[in-house]
Regions:
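Walker A (P-loop) ATP-phosphate-binding motif of ABC ATPase nucleotide-binding domains
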Residues: 363
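Switch/coupling sub-region of P-loop NTPases
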Residues: 380-499, 508-510
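The conserved Walker
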Residues: 369-370
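Conserved lysine of the Walker
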Residues: 374
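P-loop NTP-binding catalytic core
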Residues: 244-360
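NTP-binding/hydrolysis catalytic cores, primarily Walker-type P-loop NTPases
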Residues: 519-602
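N-terminal accessory targeting/assembly segments
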Residues: 8-295
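Hydrophobic anchor at the beta1->P-loop junction of P-loop NTPases
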Residues: 366
């Protein structure tokens, strides 16, 4: 019994020693209480509350003069308006709010040279994240190149070159690329630079578009998010007990950021929104300019424009498998010149031909797949239209913005709205003294019918864009659209109408490296109708032969008679433009009729 008690005492003593040792082991040094104060999340919360306090302050309770009262009311109204419009792509409002944030950080949050490095470790590059380094690089590039900062960063460091991946060639910027570029740059940070970078980080999480906020402002072709990676529903459905490490290593949809740059779609794999909720916040805010309606489960997509003229498309589940947005910008070329767009050897040939087609008032389609530069080329060739002509444009969403490029010309653009159909807009255009009609994009059956109407009765001539791959596909696609709308019931007659209206097809394409060029310029030649052969024989075998010939001609016309032919005038071969055909005599005569005497001599 005594031995048992002794053993229990020794066991308790041993346990006490072990417990005492563990409690007195050297613990890691606790974080300073102030460390949380300098986190971006804490600063964001403080800034949000500071703005709320400013807007909710009761000025009537303050003992101030009437002049000071009016001044504060004006400033508060200006702040409230800027907070609302900065999310629409309004650069002035964005800069105003960002400056306000800087003021709050310095005067209220007491950020100074001594503590600013605790927010972002400017003094210790090893502690910087890849996002920190990218934003620092972009900030310094912006100081030199303005809104062409991202363009300069990509070109100077060859980030738009194709790279080999497991499945083939792709365009991708990795974290290693950013680390390498950052090591090559020796940046000297003043306090103002550090404060600007931090203010931008806070702004983009508060009212901006997250990590793409500054990217969206750059002079690029576009930016999109949520278009790659594993959708959130996959993580809900997968059995996490099997291969949980594999699932966690896969990129999510909120890790997806792509930029469209000079015809190339480049994956910025080092950037991420950080969470599904942040991607959803950006999607919900980026399309709201001019109140286009609510994005909801029942209305799962929205197409709109932003304050700066960018086109934005937003989709959400259940219509799409994940939340995603697409911003397409049209300011990468400030004033599009044809000579800047068509750059290959022999470019004088297509440029001269396009010039005379437009001056000659030919109905012309600019075709090609997405991202080949159709809209940009259309904007550029407008300059060949006589300044004496008035232009009327019909679009689904404002994209061309021709008055920004040609402010001295008589130009007015209409678009379809929930209450005004495109057909009503077209009917109204006939009463607006328009000479030339331009359709931004012929993508649906009703728009095809508009185009045919405009080209036949509403204007001197028409220019439009289309996604057709070949000239034959262009004519047949428009024919099918006319049949779909019910404007025609006979396939041959509908095709004849299209072939009679459209004169030329300028087809654009791009190669795997993103190089854009005109693949061909093609003339559409309607096949002229010829009367049926007359029966001249009086009888016998000759009459039978003539009858069979006439019968054969009838059945050919009723079944497989060609309505039109195509003739390539200019083609692109091996990096060079070549003239391979001549315009028909009828088109040459029609062009000459619309030219001035000086232009005919030229």
């Amino acid at each position: 019994m005594n031995e048992f008690i002794l053993a229990m005492i020794l066991l308790c003593l041993f346990g006490f020693c072990v417990l005492y040792y563990r409690m007195n082991r050297i613990q890691p040094e606790p974080a300073e209480p102030d460390d949380d104060r300098y986190s971006i999340a804490a600063i964001l919360l403080f800034v949000r509350e500071a703005f709320n306090d400013i807007l909710k302050t009761n000025l009537y309770e303050m003992n101030i003069t009437r002049e000071e009262f009016d001044k504060r009311v004006h400033n508060r109204n200006q702040l409230r308006k800027a907070l609302k419009t900065c999310t629409y792509g309004d650069m002035n409002a964005k800069n105003y709010i960002r400056d306000f944030i800087k003021d709050i950080l310095v005067k209220r949050y007491n950020i100074n040279e001594g503590n600013i490095h605790r927010i972002i470790s400017f003094d210790n590059p090893d502690k910087l994240t890849v996002q920190d380094k990218f934003e620092i690089l972009l900030y310094h590039s912006k100081k030199l190149h303005g809104y062409r900062a991202l363009e300069a960063l990509i070109i100077e460091n060859h980030l738009d070159r194709p790279v080999m991946v497991a499945d083939g060639v792709s365009f991708k910027v990795t974290a290693d690329d950013i680390e390498r570029i950052f090591l090559q740059k020796q940046h000297l940070y003043c306090f103002e630079d550090k404060l600007n970078i931090i203010a931008q980080r806070v702004y983009q999480l508060y009212k901006g578009y997250g990590v793409i906020d500054e990217i969206r402002d750059m002079r690029i072709d576009g930016v999109s998010g949520g278009v790659s990676g594993i959708p959130s529903t996959f993580h809900e459905e997968v059995d996490l007990s099997v291969g949980i490490s594999i699932v966690s290593s896969l990129p999510s949809s909120y890790d997806s950021i792509w930029v469209f740059f000079k015809g190339k779609t480049i994956h910025l794999s080092f950037l991420s929104f950080g969470s599904e909720s942040e991607l959803i916040r950006v999607c919900k805010n980026i399309y709201r300019y001019n109140y286009p309606g609510q994005l909801s489960e029942s209305n799962g997509y929205k197409v709109n424009e932003m304050k700066d003229g960018s086109r934005v498309v937003v989709v959400r589940p259940p219509f799409a498998e994940s939340w995603a947005f697409f911003v397409r910008k049209f300011d990468s070329i400030e004033k599009a010149e044809v000579q800047e767009l068509i750059i290959d050897k022999g470019k004088e040939i297509p440029i001269e031909l396009i010039k005379w087609l437009v001056k000659g008032c030919r109905v012309t389609a600019v075709t090609g797949s997405q991202g080949t530069g159709k809209t940009t080329l259309l904007m550029a060739i407008i300059k060949y239209i006589s300044p004496a002509f008035t232009l009327r444009i019909q679009e689904l969403a404002f994209e061309l913005h021709l008055r920004k490029i040609y402010p001295e010309r008589n130009i007015l653009t209409f678009r379809e709205t929930p209450t005004i159909s495109g057909q009503e807009g077209l009917d109204l255009q006939k009463k607006t003294d328009g000479t030339v009609n331009i359709l931004g994009e012929v993508a649906t059956a009703p728009v095809s019918a508009w185009m045919l109407q405009m080209a036949q009765v509403a204007s001197l001539f028409t220019l439009f864009t289309h996604h057709a791959k070949t000239t034959e596909n262009l004519v047949k696609a428009l024919r099918n659209n006319l049949l779909q709308t019910g404007a025609f019931s006979n396939e041959k007659i509908a095709e004849q109408q299209v072939a009679d209206v459209i004169n030329f097809d300028i087809h654009l394409t791009k190669d795997i490296t993103g190089h854009r060029y005109i693949e061909r310029i093609t003339e559409i030649l309607p096949v002229e109708s010829v009367g049926y052969p007359n029966l001249t024989a009086s009888g016998g075998e000759a009459l039978n032969t003539e009858f069979l010939t006439a019968a054969r001609e009838f059945f050919v016309r009723m079944t497989d008679r060609k309505i039109f032919e195509t003739r390539d005038i200019v083609v692109w071969e091996n990096g060079c433009y070549k003239g391979v055909g001549r315009l028909s005599e009828g088109q040459i005569a029609s062009i000459e009729q619309t030219l001035t005497s000086d232009e005919r001599e030229e």
